[in-house]
Each structure stands twice: as C-alpha cells, then as structure tokens.
Amino acid sequence: MDLNDLLLQQQEVTNLLSNLQEAHKRILISNEDENNDLNKIRKDILICLNDLKTVNSLIIDPRDGLIKKNLHKLEKYEQELRSLESEEAAIESNLNQWKIDQDPENVRRKENWGTVPINLVGNHQYLLESYVNEVGIENTTLANTNGNHEETPNSSKFTREQLLRNARKLKLCQEQVNSEIDQLKSLISQYERDRNVINDEYNRTTELIQKEVNTLSREEDKINSQREKILKKLGLLKDHEQNQPRNFFFSLGALARVDNSDFKIALSQAYEFIDAKKQALKKILHENKSQTMSLEHNFSIWNDVIRSIQGLETNLQQSFIEKEGNVPKTDITSMISRTLSRVNSIVGTYSKDSIFTSILCELKALQKALDELNGKMQPIPIKSSAKTPELLQMGKSPPKVALSKEYASNLHESTEDFPLKINKTD
C-alpha cells in the first residue's frame, strides 16, 4: 500500500472515531431506547482503535514499515541522481576534449611552423629591370598612361644595334616570364590537388569526431532520461502516462510542483525536495512512534471497559431471566457498583487521549443508573440487548475501515460531512 493512501486512511479512521464517540456520547445522555445502536457503536469504536493501532504498526515497523521503505526509496533516488551527476560530469569532460580548436593560429603556434619558400627557375624581373634602366622608363609603355602604343618622341634616339639588342633581351624576358607562369600554374594545380585532399581528409576526420561526440551525447540523453524517470517518481515532473494526478496527503508548500517542460528547474530542486521530504517522513515517523503506546493502551482499556459493561449486561439479563424480571434493587445496584469499581480500576489515573472521554461517559452513565436506583423503591426493568450485528472486520494488510452495515445507515446525521466507506477485503 502507498504511504499517502495509508496516511489518508489513518485520517479517515481518526475522523470516523471522532464521529463514533460523538454518537456514543449522544446515545448515553439521551433518554431514547437505543441500546442496540450503543452496543454497535462500542464495538465500532474498538474496531477503529484496532485499525489505528494496525495503521501505526504499518507506518513505523522497523523492518518493512512504509516510512522506512519510503526513506530507503528517497535515499536510493538521491544516490542515483548523484551517480548520474558524476557520469554527466565525466561525459562533459570527454565532450570538451573532442572540441576542435577553431583558431588556426593556436595550432600554428603549437606546431611551430616555419615558412616554405617558392623557388622559380629564371628571373624575368631582372631582365625587365635591366631593359627599363637601359632605355629609360620614359621611353617605355610604363610611361604611357593613356595606353597608346604609338612610337614615343624619344624612340628615334636608339640606334639599330640598340634596338636589336633590346629586342633580344625582351624576347628572352618574354620566354622567361612565360616559363615562370607555367611553373606557377603547375604549383597552383598541385596546391589545388592538395587542397582537395585536405578537404576530404578534414571532412572524414570531423565525421569521425562527430560520431564520438554523438555517442557521448546519446549517453548524456540516457542520463537525462533516467533523471526524468526519477523526477517523475518524486513527483517533481508530471507523468503524462498517468490519467489521474496523484494527491499527496502531506504537502511541502515551500517547494512548488513544476511543469513537465521545466526539466532543469525540477532537477535543480531535486536534492532540496528529497531532503525536505525525508524530514517530513521522519516527523511523521516520530509522531506515530510517540502514539504507539497510547494506541495500544487505548485499545486495551476500551476493550476491558466494554467487556466489563457487556458482562454487566449479560449478568443483568441472566438475573432477569432466572427471576422472571423480579430482580431486587440491591442485586442490581451491587452488580452496577462492582462494574463501576472495575471500570475505575481499569482506567486508574489514565486521562489521556480522546478515548478517555468515551470511558468517562460510560462511568457517568453507570453512576447515573446507580443514583437513580438508590432513589427508587421498586426494581427497574432493564431490557436485554439484542444480538449485535456482525461487523466487517479489518484485514491484516492493507488495513480497511471496519463498519457495521446497520451503523453506516443509522448514523447519517452525525456523519453527514464524512462519507463512510466499506472496503471489501481483497
């Protein structure tokens, strides 16, 4: 049985007991003949006391009590969350190690790269500079800013030999620059091939890295999935698979229930919630442990009291049968006095808990009957009690509230605000 259901049932039995005691008091002080109802109420009170005793035992049992089980669950959830937290930290550390440094300068500094000179066979610039220096830049197309290739005014200064020599030098320079361009084109083609290889290898390598990252991310998702299950068990996240929401008997008002979308908020509250719930459970355990002796005592005393009173009723009934209703007043007063003394001795100095109020009502009723008898001359006929209807006894586990069928129907007025339920045993 769930602890919250048991705590709710404990409260229901407590409320029922209070209603029964009110009805018990009302019948004892009334002048109406409700002897049958009185006997049923006495037994129902005894059953409620036994139910409370049984519920108390189920709550505080040191071996398999529900408080111990729930505390064990909370400690287990806390350990699992901390273990998952450690696993997540390890995964985050691994993920950080798989990050690619996006700044090439950092890699260059780590690798301590140098420069690679590009050597070309030939030097057309030397020949070109030699030619320009020989003819003068003003006599070349470099000085023609309009792009007009017509003969310049100073071209007539060159002799035939100079023009032929310049032509040979320019021809050589032309051949050289073409050769160097071909070398550069070949180098560029090689660089492009290298670039393609680099790109292919980079993509392949990053795919391998991404696979490792994805594997770690899936592990992280599994951790969050396990966390989500724990948070749902704790009640910090709503479980959409459940059709009906769970109602808790005791609530921790300081911690607001979160929505299913607020996973991070719920996770941040988990340890605080577990600690608060553990404290609440320990408080309930302490309260119920402090009531154990009282519940045992209440049941024992009330059981002895109603046995004494039922013994009085049986003796009076037997006397009336044997003496055909003509029982001397002295015999009646003697039996009542003995019962009164016996009940007083059972109670002793005990005056704790609400059950003492019901015992006190029985004592007052006995004393009132004794006073009335002492004030009258003729014997007072006392009607025999009808056979008490059977009560639906509470099973051992789970506990069920025991009620007589007749009482459930006769006590509508006093239990109007408290629906009585008869639970069948499984």
UniProtKB/Swiss-Prot annotation:
Major place of residence: cytoplasm
Alphabetical GO biological process terms: autophagy; protein transport
Residues in coiled coil: 64-101, 165-230
GO cellular component, one term: membrane
Protein origin, superkingdom: Eukaryota
Membrane topology annotation: Peripheral membrane protein
Keywords: Autophagy, Coiled coil, Cytoplasm, Membrane, Protein transport, Transport
Family the entry assigns: Belongs to the ATG23 family.
Function noted in UniProt: Required for cytoplasm to vacuole transport (Cvt) vesicle formation and efficient autophagy. Plays a role in ATG protein retrieval from the pre-autophagosomal structure (PAS) and is especially required for autophagy-dependent cycling of ATG9. Also plays a role in regulation of filamentous growth.
Listed name of the protein: Autophagy-related protein 23
Organism name: Kluyveromyces lactis (strain ATCC 8585 / CBS 2359 / DSM 70799 / NBRC 1267 / NRRL Y-1140 / WM37) (Yeast)
